[in-house]
């Protein structure tokens, strides 16, 4: 039975009723991972059936990939292919530390750059699916960029770090709070 799903994070929560002989998996803390740790990816690539591949954690907190709105991925070189999305990324001692979600490669093929949603983030997503049947996200309602010295000079402002507000979405939380286009948020 589908409890809830979140297309944005590529996560679904299922409830299995009247099942016997199932073994649960211990959920590890992805915050304990280090670059270079060995991991195993489990999935169903191309519909071939259960498949296991191995690799290492290549990077942590990968973002700005354009895969999802909120990005904080574990990057691995374990082979993740089409059909592996939703599969487990586990440590060598069998602890779940990520949910395989995407690859970066030509034509959807594996070149050793795969991504998984960290278990620490997954816990929050799953809890929201249990409570609400969906993931609820707060939206500030601004579009902008990091402020740098070039933008600060062009705007003739004294601060050179912060968030430059380029646009405020009408009737958003930011609009209601009085934030305006051209503002710089520094703290």
Per-region residue spans from a language model:
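Serine-dependent protease modules
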Residues: 1-177
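Conserved PDZ fold ligand-binding element
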Residues: 174-187
